[in-house]
From Swiss-Prot:
Signal peptide: none annotated. It comes from the Eukaryota. It comes from Homo sapiens. InterPro entries: Phstyr_phstse_ac, PTPA_C_lid, PTPA_sf. Changing E305A: Abolishes interaction with the PP2A(D) complex. Transmembrane segments: none annotated. It is linked to Parkinson disease 25, autosomal recessive early-onset, with impaired intellectual development: An autosomal recessive, early-onset form of Parkinson disease, a complex neurodegenerative disorder characterized by bradykinesia, resting tremor, muscular rigidity and postural instability, as well as by a clinically significant response to treatment with levodopa. The pathology involves the loss of dopaminergic neurons in the substantia nigra and the presence of Lewy bodies (intraneuronal accumulations of aggregated proteins), in surviving neurons in various areas of the brain. Changing D185A: Impairs ATPase activity of the PP2A(D):PPP2R4 complex; no effect on interaction with the PP2A(D) complex. This is Serine/threonine-protein phosphatase 2A activator. It is found in: Cytoplasm; Nucleus. SUPFAM superfamilies: PTPA-like. Residues 1-20 are annotated as: Disordered. One of its GO terms (cellular component) is protein phosphatase type 2A complex. Changing M298R: In PARK25; likely pathogenic; decreases PP2A complex levels; impairs PP2A phosphatase activation.
């Protein structure tokens, strides 16, 4: 991938900070369009995009129903990293996830799924209210207030006690990841906050390289399910939607990782994702197709009209090219757009300072 802004991977010594590190409450740093230069040069940008690309490599060619024991993934991940150097998507930007001294399964994965299950249960406990407006049900604010109050307690169930000082910093990204309670909307900036939340857990050593596939297939996929339930239950508005010219009203990352899953698939090609039969038969295995199914459930009319950008992508000859193109598009349309990044928050784990060299 010929990207001009490649950054060197962060020093691995930063990946498992000592308990004495000064954690801080993340805050906004991008206040004007010229500030975007600080973001592009920041350690936060380098670590964030590296994290996204690392997971992109990890899920390549694998189904959501992939049966694995975390302890068996150690050698596989390192074999994939060797292969990645020969592939079109470079790992030069990849962030090295912290290595464990052993290959025992990570309890953090199951704890994160339990956390998301709690958010799901709260939706059931907070039904929509009757109101004149069709969109933006105000019951969402009640649901969000519960998360705002309990976020640190939830994160504390995932983070070990010796890293308890990190909880307030990490919890901010969780609260930012579920939508805006004032506007009752959700978009790719909120999705990015959840990826940042997971990235922070990796940087403090709660999640490890062994967890790479499970981060996407178990945790992020469960997050998607909860977000879709939020969107449907409370009729949330898309944040910053580009309408038919955008990729999707709400998500972007599952299209990237989902297209990576489909690279070198024996028979499913990009042209098949606009085929209703192919989607219905394979959506449980592939995030990309699950996204397409959700779109067709939520929108009416010809696919080419309500999702023109995706319709155009279906003409791309291979999934590897789709994947490369989506990564470039994500950078250009999400990470380099002021309306999205102005809401991103920076702390000690994802700092605004320029990327360190050497």
């Amino acid at each position: 991938m010929a990207e001009g802004e490649r950054q060197p991977p962060p020093d691995s010594s930063e990946e498992a900070p000592p308990a004495t590190q000064n954690f801080i409450i993340p805050k906004k740093e991008i206040h004007t369009v010229p500030d975007m230069g600080k973001w592009k040069r920041s350690q936060a940008y380098a670590d964030y995009i590296g994290f996204i690309l690392t997971l992109n490599e990890g899920v390549k060619g694998k189904k959501l129903t992939f049966e694995y024991r975390v302890s068996e993934m150690w050698n596989e991940v390192h074999e994939e990293k060797e292969q990645a150097a020969k592939q079109s998507v470079s790992c030069d930007e990849c962030i090295p996830l912290p290595r464990a001294g052993h290959c025992a399964p990570s309890e953090a994965i199951e704890k994160l799924v339990a956390l998301l299950n709690t958010l799901d249960r709260w939706i059931d406990e907070t039904p929509p209210v009757d109101q004149p407006s069709r969109f933006g049900n105000k019951a969402y604010r009640t649901w969000y207030a519960k998360l705002d109050e309990e976020a640190e307690n939830l994160v504390a169930t995932v983070v070990p006690t010796h890293l308890a000082a990190a909880v307030p910093e990490v919890a901010v990204y969780l609260k930012e990841s579920v939508g805006n309670s004032t506007r009752i909307d959700y978009g790719t900036g909120h999705e990015a906050a959840f990826a940042a939340f997971l990235c922070c857990l990796c940087k403090i050593g709660v999640l490890r390289v062994d967890d790479q596939i499970a981060i996407v297939f178990k945790v992020f996929n469960r997050y998607l399910e909860v977000m879709r339930k939020l969107q449907k239950t409370y009729r949330m508005e898309p944040a910053g939607s580009q309408g038919v010219w955008g990729l999707d009203d709400f998500q972007f990352l599952p299209f990237i990782w989902g297209s990576s899953q489909l690279i070198d698939h024996p028979y499913l090609e990009p042209r098949h994702f606009v085929d209703e039969k192919a989607v219905n038969e394979n959506h449980k295995d592939y995030m990309f197709l699950e996204c397409i199914l959700f779109i067709t459930e939520m929108k009416t009319g010809p696919f080419a009209e309500h999702s023109n950008q995706l319709w155009n992508i279906s003409a791309v000859p291979s999934w590897s090219k789709v994947n490369q193109g989506l990564i470039r598009m994500y950078k250009a349309e999400c990470l380099e757009k002021f309306p999205v990044i102005q809401h991103f928050k920076f702390g000690s784990l994802l700092p605004i300072h320029p990327v360190t060299s050497g």
